[in-house]
A protein has these predicted regions:
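Extracytoplasmic gate region of multi-pass secondary transporters
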Residues: 36-37, 237-295, 349, 353
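Helix-breaking motifs and short loop linkers at transmembrane-helix boundaries and internal kinks
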Residues: 48, 80, 101-107, 118, ...
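Conserved MFS/SLC helix-loop-helix module at the cytosolic interface between two early adjacent transmembrane helices
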Residues: 67-106
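Cytoplasmic membrane-interface "Motif A"-like loop-to-helix N-cap segments
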Residues: 77-89, 302-315
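Cytoplasmic helix-loop-helix junction between adjacent transmembrane helices
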Residues: 111-148
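Glycine-rich segments within core transmembrane alpha-helices of 12-TM secondary carriers
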Residues: 141-165, 187, 373-383
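C-terminal transmembrane helical hairpin of 12-TM major facilitator-type secondary transporters
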Residues: 307-355
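A late C-terminal transmembrane helix in Major Facilitator Superfamily
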Residues: 362-394
Length: 440
């Protein structure tokens, strides 16, 4: 076989081995952190949670997630992805199940905080893990193959959650309790499966032939040697100025993205006056639209190579959608604005994480990715909390969405300014992808 044939076969085998399993884990990751948005349709009234209490509880997850993300990713780089991702999945699944016993706002806050602590490091850990297996020119498509689980978790989870809400009375449990129990158990099982299924590095992959192992190992070693900022320690990597600049766009994404995600079912029901089950189906349709954009965004990002430009475009969708949610009447038009907003996620996510993995290598990459994710993810606390507080105190969420749209616009301008500083060009002989001279 020619070298290009070896490359094609190797990357296909790596993709088929790793991406479906990580994709499944990621679906439940998102399902267990965001299923309170569906549970809230029933839980808030039963437990008498105010808008402010729900918003704070939804967001407090991200405070602990942010605090423990960097140390979690450093441990992953030391002990290997197989064991650490398994630990994360098992503990978050058990804590997700424990949400069914919540009765007071304080208990709600405590379990959400512990859930964030348990899940800390999963997403940046997966990004780092992919950077060990996928060359830069394949990475956006690999990332898109994983994070398409974000909208699909809602496409599947919203109707499933709506159905589980209908189990009220079965086993003397409320429907929202069944929701947390049923959706929390699978990650525990997947965590144990990860111990047997995942492989830490290409050099250890017995499921690849010797020729395939040699190709991917040498290719990844070559990329590590050519890394733009070849920091030799995690602490030195954290001083890279571009990493700190990248925090703002990600913070903007998390603030408006999580703010919208946790409130979407309630906003849809308020706008259309639908039942809980019908609301869940409509929410699923919104995320289905976003899911269809993921593979297209990943292919386009790899083809043109303009990572920062694509990231800015994603934030522009968030901005336009946020303005629409704020200003349009509470009708189907507001639901369409929510759909426009959610389309920004695949465009942003498939490109953004290619930038830090190009800047850093090894444990430095693990630390850098975790730094961006941990600080940026605090937006997941502020977004839902701000919407809930303003909704309760002013009776409207329009001001909150206008402010979040402005933050998204600021993040887009930062990405545009970063294009020259993070230039990325695909290899001329990349199979199936035209060479590009555009910047990242």
């Amino acid at each position: 076989m020619t070298e290009q044939d070896v490359e094609l076969v190797t990357m296909r085998r790596v993709s088929l081995r790793l991406l479906p399993f990580l994709f499944l884990l990621y679906i439940f990751c998102w399902l267990d952190r965001s299923n309170i948005s569906i549970a809230a349709l029933q839980m808030n009234s039963e437990l008498k949670f105010s808008s402010a209490a729900f918003g704070f509880g939804a967001g407090v997850f991200f405070l602990s997630y942010s605090l423990f993300e960097v140390p979690s990713n450093l441990i992953l780089a030391r002990v290997g992805a197989r064991r650490w991702l398994a630990r994360i999945a098992i503990t978050w699944g058990l804590l997700a199940c424990s949400m069914m016993w919540v009765r007071t706002p304080l208990q709600f806050y405590a379990v959400r905080f512990l859930l964030g602590m348990a899940e800390a490091g999963f997403f940046p850990g997966v990004i780092y893990y992919l950077s060990l297996w996928f060359p830069a020119t394949y990475r956006a498509r690999a990332i898109s193959g994983i994070i398409i689980g974000i909208p699909l978790s809602q496409v599947l989870g919203a109707p499933l959650g709506g159905a589980l809400l209908g189990l009220t009375g079965v086993g003397h449990l409320s429907g929202w309790q069944w929701l947390f129990l049923v959706e929390g158990l699978p990650p525990v099982l997947l965590g144990f499966a990860a111990l047997a299924y995942l492989t830490d590095r290409p050099e250890d992959a017995r499921w690849l032939s010797t020729q395939q192992r040699d190709w991917v190992s040498s290719r990844m070693q070559l990329e590590r040697e050519q890394t733009v900022a070849a920091h030799d320690s995690p602490l030195r990597a954290l001083g890279h100025p571009l990493l700190w600049v990248l925090i703002l766009p990600y913070f903007a994404l998390c603030t408006i993205g999580y703010g919208a995600t946790f409130w979407t079912p309630l906003l849809v029901r308020d706008a259309l006056g639908t039942s809980d089950s019908a609301t869940a189906v409509i929410v699923g349709a919104i995320y289905l639209l976003a899911a269809l954009v993921y593979p297209l965004a990943g292919m386009l990002s790899d083809r043109i190579g303009d990572r920062c430009g694509m990231t800015a475009l994603g934030l522009a969708f968030y901005c336009v959608g946020g303005i629409g949610v704020a200003l349009l009447p509470h009708t189907i038009l507001r639901v369409l604005a929510l759909a426009v907003l959610q389309i920004g996620n695949p465009i942003f996510m498939t490109s953004f994480w290619c930038v830090p993995t190009k800047l850093l290598k090894g444990s430095s990459a693990a630390a850098g990715i975790a730094l961006i994710s941990s600080i940026g993810t605090t937006g997941g606390f502020f977004g839902p909390s701000i919407i809930g507080y303003l909704k309760q105190t002013t009776g409207s969420d329009s001001g909150a969405f206008l402010g979040l749209a402005g933050l998204a616009l600021l993040g887009a301008f930062v990405c545009i300014g970063l294009r020259q500083a993070t230039a990325f060009r695909p290899r001329p002989n990349l199979i199936g992808v035209a060479p590009s001279s555009q910047s990242a």
